[in-house]
Every structure is written in C-alpha cells, then in structure tokens.
C-alpha cells in the first residue's frame, strides 16, 4: 500500500448535489464500514439524504450505478473483492472497473470507485476506514465523486458562458 503522493482528502460543500451510493452485500463487516464512511463524507459535504442501494455483489455494481446516474449528480460504488485461488478475481475486478468507468463516461456523471481489490482480508480492513486503518476508501471515493460533480457543473456552466467562479 503506497500513500506516497496521495493528496489530503477534503470534502467540498455540495449540499445541492444528489448522491447515489451502491454497496455490495459480500464481506459485510468491511462493506458496511465503507458505507458508513461514505455517508460520513456525504454528511460533511452537506448532502442531506443520499440514495443508498444494496446489491448482491460487485458484478452488479455497474448496472445499478448506471441507473443511479440517471437521477443523481454523483454516484459511489462500494465493495470488496478478495483474491481466491482461481482467475475469477481478475475477471470480476476487470469487469467492475471497466463497467464503472463506462457508466461514468456514458452518463457524464462521476462514479467514485470505492471497490477494494485486495489479496487478503487484512489488506481490505486496512483500507476500509476503521480506527486503525491506514486508508479510508469509502470516504475518499465519496469526496472525489462530489468534487468531480462540482467541477462538471462549473464546466457545463462555462459552455453556457458562465465559466468558473
């Protein structure tokens, strides 16, 4: 895990934005904590009532995030994929990452990728935002999605002659 070069996580004031969060049910201890931290970031940003949807697993995240993107300014995907003894890990990770990127581009809506792809459960715990975790990916993914939504809002205003303030 390399934290070198990582900027300090800051949460923008984004109370006017609509946020959708999709979280998987697998690895509940970790995923529930990712969700708690995502909701903490949303609250800190002033987002009153994010839409939260639970899905069976990581493969289902892209299609649910695509639907959320139709009605929200920013979306966050939360989950955990832990390497096993078969190539399934690579298939799932590649599919989820490509799917979430495609949703973001196709819908012009930022999708914060808070899906942990780890070799071990210990690595996932270290990234999930617990008291003794080195990283806080649910919080970070939410802050990034909200900040990007605000940048897009300003850029779209620029197209209408407003520009950045």
Curated annotation (Swiss-Prot):
Q: List this protein's GO terms for biological process.
A: riboflavin biosynthetic process
On whether Transferase is a keyword of this UniProt record, the answer is yes
- Its EC top class is transferase
User: In which residues is 5-amino-6-(D-ribitylamino)uracil bound?
Assistant: 26, 58-60, 80-82, 113
Catalysis performed (reactions): (2S)-2-hydroxy-3-oxobutyl phosphate + 5-amino-6-(D-ribitylamino)uracil = 6,7-dimethyl-8-(1-D-ribityl)lumazine + phosphate + 2 H2O + H(+)
Q: What is its EC number?
A: 2.5.1.78
Matching CDD domains? Lumazine_synthase-I
Pfam name, any one: DMRL_synthase
Q: Which residues bind (2S)-2-hydroxy-3-oxobutyl phosphate?
A: 85-86, 127
Tell me which UniProt keywords the record has, alphabetically.
Answer: Riboflavin biosynthesis, Transferase
* Source organism superkingdom: Bacteria
Q: Part of which pathway? A: Cofactor biosynthesis; riboflavin biosynthesis; riboflavin from 2-hydroxy-3-oxobutyl phosphate and 5-amino-6-(D-ribitylamino)uracil: step 1/2
Q: Which residues form the active site?
A: 88 (proton donor)
Q: Name one GO cellular component term.
A: riboflavin synthase complex
Which InterPro entries does the entry mention? LS, LS/RS, LS/RS_sf
Give the matching Gene3D superfamilies: Lumazine/riboflavin synthase (3.40.50.960)
Q: Name one GO molecular function term.
A: 6,7-dimethyl-8-ribityllumazine synthase activity
Task: Give yes or no: UniProt keyword Transferase.
Answer: yes
HAMAP family registered for this protein in UniProt: Lumazine_synth
Function description: Catalyzes the formation of 6,7-dimethyl-8-ribityllumazine by condensation of 5-amino-6-(D-ribitylamino)uracil with 3,4-dihydroxy-2-butanone 4-phosphate. This is the penultimate step in the biosynthesis of riboflavin.
The family annotation for this protein states: Belongs to the DMRL synthase family.
Protein name (database record)? 6,7-dimethyl-8-ribityllumazine synthase
Q: Which gene encodes it?
A: ribH
């Amino acid at each position: 895990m390399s934290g070198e070069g990582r900027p300090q996580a800051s949460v923008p004031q984004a109370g006017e934005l609509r946020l959708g969060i999709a979280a998987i049910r697998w690895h509940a201890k970790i995923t529930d904590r990712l969700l708690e931290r995502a909701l903490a970031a949303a609250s800190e940003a002033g987002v009153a009532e994010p839409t939260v949807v639970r899905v069976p697993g990581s493969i289902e995240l892209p299609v649910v995030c695509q639907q959320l993107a139709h009605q929200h300014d920013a979306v966050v995907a939360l989950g955990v994929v832990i390497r096993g003894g078969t190539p399934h890990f690579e298939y799932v990770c590649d599919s989820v990452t490509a799917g979430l990127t495609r949703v973001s581009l196709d819908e012009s809506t930022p999708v914060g990728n808070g899906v942990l792809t780890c070799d071990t459960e210990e690595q996932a715990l270290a990234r999930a935002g617990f008291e003794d975790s080195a990283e806080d990916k649910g919080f970070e993914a939410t802050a990034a999605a909200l900040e990007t939504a605000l940048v897009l809002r300003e850029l779209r205003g620029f197209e209408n002659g407003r520009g950045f303030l």
